[in-house]
């Protein structure tokens, strides 16, 4: 992500971090963390996700140490070396690095003003047998495109028909 250079923004970030640390259990922060997140982590995640996922429950939440670790785990579980994952034609560079390291092929779906092509995804499902669809639907990195609701629904319908898991990297969806 871009590094802030505005002194006022940096001061607010420093003050916020100091406020968090002032009330934190430092020993808990320095020890190994609970696998999948602490109950407090999961409660915070449920609070964050509930506006979009009203039935969200802490028992179905897995907290990870960052997107790279989570993507590496997901990609390694869904695809083996030489297998394929569909992505937007311009996709998150971190995913490219992970796929390269794991030997997974990324198949680029062409983009238009609404997002990745649904017809291209359907054709890929029929002919290439992808193991997953990775998408970054809100402020697609690096294009800043937001995928339309109708396109999201079309992609989801295709994924359901072909039993293709979707990895939705939607860090900005709540903004």
Question: Which residues are covered by each model-predicted region?
Answer:
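N-terminal "arm"/small-domain region of PLP-dependent enzymes with the aminotransferase-like
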Residues: 1-36, 40
């Amino acid at each position: 992500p871009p590094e802030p250079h505005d002194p006022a923004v940096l001061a607010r970030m420093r003050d916020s971090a100091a406020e968090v640390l002032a009330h934190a259990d430092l020993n808990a922060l320095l020890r190994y963390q609970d696998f999948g997140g602490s109950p407090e982590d999961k409660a915070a995640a449920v609070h964050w996700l509930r506006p979009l996922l009203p039935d969200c429950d802490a028992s179905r939440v897995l907290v990870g140490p960052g997107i790279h670790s989570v993507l590496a785990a997901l990609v390694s579980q869904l695809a083996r070396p030489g297998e394929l994952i569909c992505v937007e034609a311009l996709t998150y560079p971190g995913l490219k690095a992970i796929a390269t390291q794991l030997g997974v092929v990324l198949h680029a779906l062409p983009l238009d003003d609404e997002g990745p092509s649904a017809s291209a995804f359907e054709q890929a499902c029929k002919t290439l047998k992808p193991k997953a669809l990775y998408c970054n639907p809100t402020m697609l990195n690096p294009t800043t495109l937001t995928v339309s609701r109708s396109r999201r629904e079309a992609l989801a319908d295709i994924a359901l028909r072909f039993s293709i898991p979707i990895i939705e990297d939607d860090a900005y969806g709540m903004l």
